Structure formats: structure tokens, C-alpha cells
A protein has these predicted regions:
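Extracellular beta-strand scaffolds
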Residues: 1-3, 7-11, 15-23, 27-36, ...
Length: 149
């Protein structure tokens, strides 16, 4: 699945693919009940090869964000708060506006997040074998960052 929008792409449903899912827009917004998924098999499980890439000036993905291989988000501001996000590798690259995984559940084999702004994981849960966070400011009030490897 390859989606391009010149303005806002508003996902209030499900965008699912057997392979890769790539989304480019000025703004990407996904509601709490939405799904972005890549690498789904016939039963709806992430077992097939597939990567999910979201690229926009502002990404707000508060639903389920799933990929078998890599989930990559590139944006000035990344808001994954309240989401359920899982992939083999998760790569979050944000600008000055920062990254939020507040009250989210994020699971990966390898999690990499880079921002010159704040990384907010208040009430969130990050679990990965390998975690690399590059930021000058981490807020983790009542959050959990669990590196298992």
C-alpha cells in the first residue's frame, strides 16, 4: 500500500497490507481505533515480510501501528501517545517538536528514537531487546523503559 496526500491524511479505519505500507502527507492523523499494518497474513497476524513507513511534518498515530519488519516514522513531531505499536525494528526520527509515547505500549526487538526535542514516555511502556534513545530531555513519569537484552 502506498498512500500520498498533499494535505492531511486522516485514518479512522484500517490500512493493512500483506507487504509494505508507505504513507506520505503534510499531516498524518490516526484515531485511537485506527490501524496501520504491514506484513499481515491471512489471519491478520504480522508474520509476512512487511515494513510500515510514515512520513509527514506532523504524525499523530494513536491506534495500532504494526509491522513485521521495520516501522519507521519521520516527522517534526511524532505523537504515538495511547497507541499500541509493535515491530521488529522501530525507528522514530523527529525534529524539535519531539516524540511522545505517553500512555502507549511499544514493543520491538530494536527501538531507536532520535529528537533534539523532548522524548515523553509518561505512563508509557517501552519494551525492546535493544533500546537507543537520543534526546536532551526524557520525561518518564510513571512510565517504563525495559531493555530485555
Amino acid at each position: 500500500v502506498n498512500l500520498q496526500a498533499g494535505g492531511t491524511l486522516d485514518n479512522r479505519g484500517r490500512v493493512e497490507a500483506r507487504g509494505d505500507t508507505t504513507v506520505n502527507a503534510d499531516t498524518i492523523h490516526s484515531s485511537h481505533n485506527s490501524v496501520w499494518a504491514a506484513g499481515l497474513d491471512d489471519n491478520g497476524n504480522t508474520t509476512r515480510p512487511g515494513s510500515l513507513t510514515l512520513t509527514a511534518q506532523h504524525v499523530q498515530a494513536n491506534g495500532k501501528n504494526l509491522a513485521t519488519d521495520t516501522l519507521a516514522v519521520h516527522s517534526q513531531q511524532i505523537d504515538l501517545s495511547d497507541s499500541q505499536t509493535a515491530a521488529g525494528q522501530i525507528q522514530l526520527t523527529a525534529g524539535q517538536s519531539g516524540i511522545s509515547t505517553a500512555h502507549a505500549t511499544v514493543n520491538a526487538d530494536r527501538l531507536t528514537a532520535k529528537t533534539p526535542g523532548q522524548f515523553n514516555n509518561d505512563g508509557g511502556q517501552l519494551v525492546a531487546r535493544e533500546i537507543h534513545l537520543t534526546t536532551p530531555d526524557i520525561s518518564n513519569l510513571k512510565g517504563k523503559i525495559n531493555q530485555t537484552g
